[in-house]
A protein has these predicted regions:
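A short acidic, often aromatic-flanked loop/helix-cap motif at beta-alpha or helix-coil junctions
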Residues: 11, 62, 122-128, 150-151
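Acidic/histidine-rich, metal-coordinating catalytic segments
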Residues: 7, 79-92, 119-122, 127
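Short, basic/hydrophobic alpha-helical segments
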Residues: 64-82
Length: 181
């Protein structure tokens, strides 16, 4: 069984802006060609290996969620997948219900190929994947002078996340630790 801590991130052109040093009482101008440019990413952190699986999508919705899960299935063929995720409507919507019914058809619950479990409502601090997104956006802010186009911002973000060696004490919340009795 593979446990994946999943979340979506919406990267916008404004995410590259942060704090910079400048002369006092002098505004710093950062040109933005289109503040509405946006890229949605699906990401899941493997609980055991801490490997991060990044996937570009046009939006966060049921169709793209199912596509992401199918893509994750290709990464772990013949392994049951458990997704821990937030309460986004498309995680439990019509497309997901149909996908789960087809994928797990006629199989007992313990043997399902794909299972989705929700974190507590309104508790993003429970999901270590939120910390991955924060690290990626923090990296972007440090690279603001280098990334002149939104395509460069997207490339910088995904390259950083693909190379990231992520560790977090939050992962131990979901993984049993050995204790002497």
């Amino acid at each position: 069984m593979i446990v994946l801590l999943e979340d979506e991130c919406h990267l916008v052109w404004g995410d590259v802006c942060g704090m910079v040093w400048g002369k006092r009482n002098t505004p710093i101008v950062v040109p933005m060609t289109n503040e509405r440019e946006r890229q949605t990413y699906y990401g899941a952190l493997n609980l055991l290996t801490q490997e991060f699986h990044l996937y570009e999508a046009s939006a966060g919705n049921g169709v793209n969620t199912v596509a992401y899960i199918r893509w994750c299935q290709t990464l772990y063929p013949d392994k049951p997948l458990v997704f821990l995720w937030d309460g986004a409507s498309y995680h439990r919507g019509e497309e997901m219900q149909k996908f789960l019914a087809e994928t797990n058809d006629g199989v007992a619950g313990a043997d399902w190929k794909v299972t989705g479990m929700r974190f507590a409502p309104n508790a993003p601090e429970q999901n270590p994947t939120e910390d991955v997104w924060l690290k990626g956006k923090t990296h972007l802010r440090k690279q603001f002078a280098v990334n002149k186009t939104f395509a460069q911002v997207k490339r910088c973000f995904s390259t950083f996340l693909h190379a990231l060696q992520f560790t977090s004490t939050k992962l131990s919340w979901y993984w049993p630790t050995e204790q002497m009795i």
